[in-house]
Design a protein with these regions (language model features):
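Short hydrophobic/Thr-rich beta-strand motif most characteristic of the beta2 strand and flanking loop
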Residues: 30-37, 45
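Receiver (REC) domain active-site loop signature in two-component systems and cognate sites
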Residues: 60-61
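Acidic catalytic/metal-coordinating carboxylates
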Residues: 37-38, 64-67
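Alpha4 helix (beta4-alpha4-beta5 surface) of REC/receiver domains from two-component response regulators
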Residues: 67, 88-103, 109-112, 116
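Short amphipathic alpha-helix used as the core "switch/output" element in two-component signaling
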Residues: 44, 66-78
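Non-catalytic signal-transmission and effector/linker regions of two-component phosphorelay proteins
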Residues: 1-10, 16-23, 112-126
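Active-site beta3 strand of CheY-like receiver
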Residues: 49-55
Length: 126
């Protein structure tokens, strides 16, 4: 699967190995990727640059991904959110989707499924 446009995907995760692997995967198919481990820096960047897609972890020490998602809606309402987390909790999944997440993936998801989710979020009308 190849990214047809140069949409920007921002990653937010407190685990450097997840950031590196996810960035490498998205880079390999042509996405423009920005990676963050700090939720505040991520939100400041999103407010200034309005990324097309944000891939957000739920469990982070500074701020939960659900709180980040809520704040992101205020500063960059057009950014589509994908949750990528280790926490497979149906109530958290429901909250994220109800708050507007385009997709919810558990870490370890098949690369092709994750990439399809990012593509669908980047091109919601297709």
């Amino acid at each position: 699967m190849v990214a047809l446009n140069k949409e920007t995907v921002c990653l937010l995760d407190d685990d450097p190995s997840i950031l590196k692997a996810t960035r490498r995967l998205l880079d390999s198919v042509g996405w423009k990727v920005e990676a963050f481990s700090d939720p505040i820096a991520f939100l400041e960047h999103a407010a200034a640059h309005h990324p097309d897609v944000a891939v957000i972890d739920i469990l982070m020490p500074q701020m939960s991904g659900l709180e980040v998602q809520t704040r992101l809606r205020r500063v960059s309402p057009s950014t589509r959110v994908i949750v990528l987390t280790a926490k497979d909790d149906p109530s958290i999944r429901r909250m994220a989707i109800n708050a507007g997440a385009s997709a919810f993936f558990i870490k370890g998801v098949e690369s092709c499924d994750f990439l399809a989710g990012v593509k669908a979020a980047a091109d919601p009308g297709k």
